Amino acid sequence: MPKLRSATTTHGRNMAGARALWRATGMTDEDFGKPIIAVVNSFTQFVPGHVHLKDLGQLVAREIEAAGGVAKEFNTIAVDDGIAMGHGGMLYSLPSRELIADSVEYMVNAHCADAMVCISNCDKITPGMLMAALRINIPVIFVSGGPMEAGKTKLSDQIIKLDLVDAMIQGADPKVSDAQSEQVERSACPTCGSCSGMFTANSMNCLTEALGLSQPGNGSMLATHADREQLFKLAGQRIVTLAKRYYQQDDESALPRNIATKAAFENAMALDIAMGGSTNTVLHLLAAAQEAGVDFTMADIDRMSRKVPQLCKVAPSTQKYHMEDVHRAGGVVAILGQLEKAGLVHGDTRTVLGGSLAELLNEYDVSRQPSQEVVDFYRAGPAGIRTTKAFSQDCRWPELDVDRAEGCIRSLEHAYSLEGGLAVLSGNLALDGAIVKTAGVDDEHLCFRGPARVFESQDTAVAGILDGTVKAGEVVVIRYEGPKGGPGMQEMLYPTTYLKSMGLGKQCALITDGRFSGGTSGLSIGHVSPEAASGGTIGLVADGDIININIPARSMVLEVADSVLAARRVAVEARGWKPLDRQRQVSFALRAYAMLATSADKGAVRDRSKLEE
């Protein structure tokens, strides 16, 4: 029978000092011997996805204590990628994932916590906490802050839905008036919550459901809706049950590594492909798998991308649907239900609810025979009222969207595409692979061949797009923006947004060893590995070189003779794999991150071989 980790600090005469300090936090004699549950919050006033989390940690804590546990809350940092984007702040976004993972490990292990509830929401916070949870391997439940309501405004006598990306595109389009741009800006982000489309934050919160580590509705129930409060309360109750199963019943199935197995990672990837999730999820799943000791690689993703269909299309791939519409159609469970019918997910994986995924689908899939309680849960909808408060409204859709032929979530027979929303490309330009979000690429652009226009940084690329240097038909190459070369692997949302603003969104392709926001659409290929700073071929591309992209064939080829590339490699190695004339201040903290960073095909995690020397 495993001993409570916290007993190290609460039992024995030699721990009198530790107990004295625990008493100073409010613990009593009756609390020593109960499981100590870390409530890992991420409240901050900097981030709309986290601005409403301040009191939610204590909401969970009260439920933990009522169920027989002891709750202790602490906070992690949280970076808003949208606010950090387009300037030096974006260098810190991906590295913050590692800091979050480490800070959770430090706090939980230093104080010998027995289990965790992770309250996350936005881009790097969920992945960072996920990495920590799988690293530490104690009982855990994830509960996110929930998605923002979609913005709405009236343009050209038509009410349209909006999000952050619309505000960026309108703001950069010289043909859009100041008044219209301001109108969109003021309407795009109306409430607290993670940005309203299938961007990175919402994608990751959906994937925790497929991994079995969060409850139904975690990824899709709006931040503002009263029904979301129940997810937080149940998380507090269920984590105590999980802790007791492990520590009192020696039930190792309650541990996250026995829930998030190889099969569960395949379920998560199948979901990601089917819903057209952010390419960043690939990076984070690879990183989490390494922490879990699961052999899940780019080869697995490539294999799955060829057989899993795209069943859902959500902003930024379409303006018609946002996360509130995904929830109305049954959320993650409904997508997984369609995949199960097609034999594309493993129904025998376990979840934090205690049963199998198949059992969960039978209870919560709105396409089956759900209870009225489940129906009402998925009818929860937006109120259209600007607010920063959680659980502040209880509006409901008049009916569910269960149209699997033309609705938000499709059946296999009516799939948007029989091949899914993400694809792995390879070739001499990306020997270890690259990722493209095919859900955001029009069919006529799946093949593209053109001359390279090379930039040594995102900043020079943005300038080149806006000043007309970039021409229709070119392949924009942005290099030295990978995990090591950036450092920090910046998101390239501004270059892709400005290509659209300049009328080049469907006239150019973009290739980078950096990454893309979940808000990116169009022929945007990221995560090129090896990155330029690690000697990747992308560091050898010259202006005018022909690049041939063929997504159906999963290939990306630089049409330059091997002898020419070999000569270029000698020249670059002589000067070092560094950008030419890049004006960028890189802090000591970022340099330290870069020293251990691996390329994207490894999840941009630390190079463990360097730590084991």
Swiss-Prot record:
PANTHER family in the record: D-XYLONATE DEHYDRATASE (PTHR43661), D-XYLONATE DEHYDRATASE YAGF-RELATED (PTHR43661:SF3)
Protein name: Dihydroxy-acid dehydratase
Cellular component GO terms, alphabetical: cytosol
GO biological process: isoleucine biosynthetic process; L-valine biosynthetic process
PROSITE patterns from the UniProt entry: ILVD_EDD_1, ILVD_EDD_2
Entry's family note: Belongs to the IlvD/Edd family.
Complexes and interactors: Homodimer.
Catalytic activity: (2R)-2,3-dihydroxy-3-methylbutanoate = 3-methyl-2-oxobutanoate + H2O; (2R,3R)-2,3-dihydroxy-3-methylpentanoate = (S)-3-methyl-2-oxopentanoate + H2O
Binding, [2Fe-2S] cluster: C122, C195
Obligatory cofactor(s): [2Fe-2S] cluster; Mg(2+)
Gene3D superfamilies: IlvD/EDD C-terminal domain-like (3.50.30.80)
Species this chain originates from: Aeromonas salmonicida (strain A449)
Modified residues (N6-carboxylysine): K124
Binding site for Mg(2+): D81, D123, K124, E491
Textual note on the cofactor: Binds 1 [2Fe-2S] cluster per subunit. This cluster acts as a Lewis acid cofactor.
Family annotation (Pfam families): ILV_EDD_C, ILVD_EDD_N
Enzyme class: lyase
InterPro entries: Dihydro-acid_dehy_C, DihydroxyA_deHydtase, DiOHA_6PGluconate_deHydtase_CS, ILV_EDD_C, ILV_EDD_N, IlvD/EDD_N
Keywords associated with the record: 2Fe-2S, Amino-acid biosynthesis, Branched-chain amino acid biosynthesis, Iron, Iron-sulfur, Lyase, Magnesium, Metal-binding
Taxonomic superkingdom: Bacteria
Associated pathway: Amino-acid biosynthesis; L-isoleucine biosynthesis; L-isoleucine from 2-oxobutanoate: step 3/4; Amino-acid biosynthesis; L-valine biosynthesis; L-valine from pyruvate: step 3/4
E.C. designation(s): 4.2.1.9
GO MF annotation: an example: dihydroxy-acid dehydratase activity
Active site: S517
